[in-house]
């Protein structure tokens, strides 16, 4: 139980300064916050008293409504004054970026700073059970140095794996969760503008064994009627020519089913765009124009392909 302060103006309450949270993920998809209320000289002075209503407050960035904020009650966890709050794997969070705050009664919530994170469960070798929903939460440091949690909630989900750019094609391995691959399954490239038509290529079962980190299935439990399926596909880059446009990649499990956005979320990297860099491949269209094609991950960790028409200077520099 968190102790109540003598009064709202007590020195103990005022000692809360630059609160910081260590985060630990578990294999079920839960997330634990261990909050230090002060640091440096303030920390050595002893643990501040905080109200019983103390909580970690998560706010979904740029969103409003009852499902855009969540309070996680804090309880005293250790003699050193740290407080602990838990986000269970069964708690359903909307997909997005959740900013983390410390709230103490009627006081204005304070932004939490990031501490030491233990995310080993996100990159473990345990097999992922078949799930109706995949819920992923990754704590990270924002560009302003604050703590936030990146979340995904998808059903079904197509997880991108090994990707190779060579021989005028993108060769891709992946895994489908929450649905079955049929004989009519295909990889689709959808242009972001209406000037071009979608491109389809067949996918084939991939027998190469791979392991993925475990993810949570909020609320809905295990769907034994659907199973994990590995797949592989080859997308000829020439099929994305000519023009200058972006193509988004989707997996259609069966001809009569809706496509599933292809992405990569089952690890400890919240922003793939800055980390995963793939080489550009030079491709020539039928009219002889040189193009550059490069796969990349979007800000939401979805997989896309950027196709650009090379300028004369770029072509001559080759």
Regions from the PLM with identified roles:
Residues 1-318:
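Basic, ligand-binding patches in group-transfer machinery
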């Amino acid at each position: 139980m968190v102790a109540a302060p003598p009064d709202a103006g007590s020195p103990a309450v005022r000692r809360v300064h630059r609160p910081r949270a260590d985060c630990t993920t578990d294999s079920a998809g839960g997330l634990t916050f261990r909050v230090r209320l002060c640091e440096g000289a303030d920390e050595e002075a002893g643990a501040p008293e905080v109200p019983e209503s103390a909580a970690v407050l998560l706010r979904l960035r740029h969103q409003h409504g009852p499902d855009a904020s969540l309070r996680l009650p804090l309880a005293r966890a250790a003699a050193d004054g740290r407080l602990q709050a838990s986000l269970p794997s069964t708690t359903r969070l909307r997909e997005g970026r959740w900013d983390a705050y410390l709230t103490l009664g009627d006081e204005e919530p304070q932004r939490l700073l990031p501490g030491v994170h233990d995310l080993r469960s996100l990159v473990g070798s345990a097999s992922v059970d078949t799930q109706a929903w995949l819920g992923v939460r990754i704590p990270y440091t924002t560009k302003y140095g604050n703590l936030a949690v990146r979340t995904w909630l998808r059903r079904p989900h197509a997880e991108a794996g090994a990707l190779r750019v060579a021989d005028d094609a993108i060769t891709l391995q992946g895994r489908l969760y929450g649905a079955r691959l049929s004989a009519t399954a295909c990889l689709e490239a959808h242009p972001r503008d209406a000037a071009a038509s979608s491109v389809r290529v067949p996918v084939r079962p991939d027998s190469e064994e791979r392991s993925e980190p475990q993810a949570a299935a909020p609320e809905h439990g295990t769907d034994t009627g659907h199973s994990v399926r590995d797949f592989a596909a080859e997308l000829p880059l020439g099929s994305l020519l000519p023009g200058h446009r972006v193509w988004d990649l989707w997996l259609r499990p069966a001809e009569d089913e809706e496509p599933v956005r292809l992405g990569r979320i089952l690890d400890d990297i919240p922003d793939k765009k800055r980390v995963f860099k793939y080489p550009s491949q030079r491709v020539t269209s039928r009219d002889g124009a040189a193009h550059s094609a490069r796969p990349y991950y979007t800000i939401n960790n979805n997989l896309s392909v950027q196709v650009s028409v090379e300028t004369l200077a770029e072509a001559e520099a080759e």
